[in-house]
C-alpha cells in the first residue's frame, strides 16, 4: 500500500509556506519555489549581516572625510594625527559628532593637529 504522507507532509509544507509569506508570485504559493526562496533569503541575510558592518564603516568614513575637508585636512591625515595624539575615539562617534555636533568635531580636529605637531 502506498503511503502519501498525510498530515505530516501537510504540516511540513505549511511551515515552509508560512516562512515564505509575503513573497511575490508563486514563491508564496508553490511549495518547491517557496522553499527555494526561503533558503535563498537566509543566504542573503547571512551575507548582508556581514556587509552591513562594512557599509556603515564606509558611511562613517565618508562623513568624517567631508567634515574634515571643511576643516582643511583630509581623512587620512586626520586619523593619523588622532592616533599620534592618543585620542581614543572611534569612527562611529567621530561621524556622529561631524553630523550633529560640529563644534565638538572642530575642537577634536584642532586638538589632534596641536598635539601631533
Swiss-Prot record:
Keywords carried by this UniProt record: Ribonucleoprotein, Ribosomal protein, RNA-binding, rRNA-binding
Protein name stated in the entry: Large ribosomal subunit protein bL20
PROSITE patterns the record matches: RIBOSOMAL_L20
Molecular-function annotations in GO: rRNA binding; structural constituent of ribosome
PANTHER family assigned: 39S RIBOSOMAL PROTEIN L20
Primary role: Binds directly to 23S ribosomal RNA and is necessary for the in vitro assembly process of the 50S ribosomal subunit. It is not involved in the protein synthesizing functions of that subunit.
GO biological process: ribosomal large subunit assembly; translation
Superkingdom field: Bacteria
Keyword Lyase among UniProt keywords: no
Gene Ontology annotations for the cellular component aspect, listed alphabetically: ribonucleoprotein complex; ribosome
Family, per entry: Belongs to the bacterial ribosomal protein bL20 family.
Amino acid at each position: 500500500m502506498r503511503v502519501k504522507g498525510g498530515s505530516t507532509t501537510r504540516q511540513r509544507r505549511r511551515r515552509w509556506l508560512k516562512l515564505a509569506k509575503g513573497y511575490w508570485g508563486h514563491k508564496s504559493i508553490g511549495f518547491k519555489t517557496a522553499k527555494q526562496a526561503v533558503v535563498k533569503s537566509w543566504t542573503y541575510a547571512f551575507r548582508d549581516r556581514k556587509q552591513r558592518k562594512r557599509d556603515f564603516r564606509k558611511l562613517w568614513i565618508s562623513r568624517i572625510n567631508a567634515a574634515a575637508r571643511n576643516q582643511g585636512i583630509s581623512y587620512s591625515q586626520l586619523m593619523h594625527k588622532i592616533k599620534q595624539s592618543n585620542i581614543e575615539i572611534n569612527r562611529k562617534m567621530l561621524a556622529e559628532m561631524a553630523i550633529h555636533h560640529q563644534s565638538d568635531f572642530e575642537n577634536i580636529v584642532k586638538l589632534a593637529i596641536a598635539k601631533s605637531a
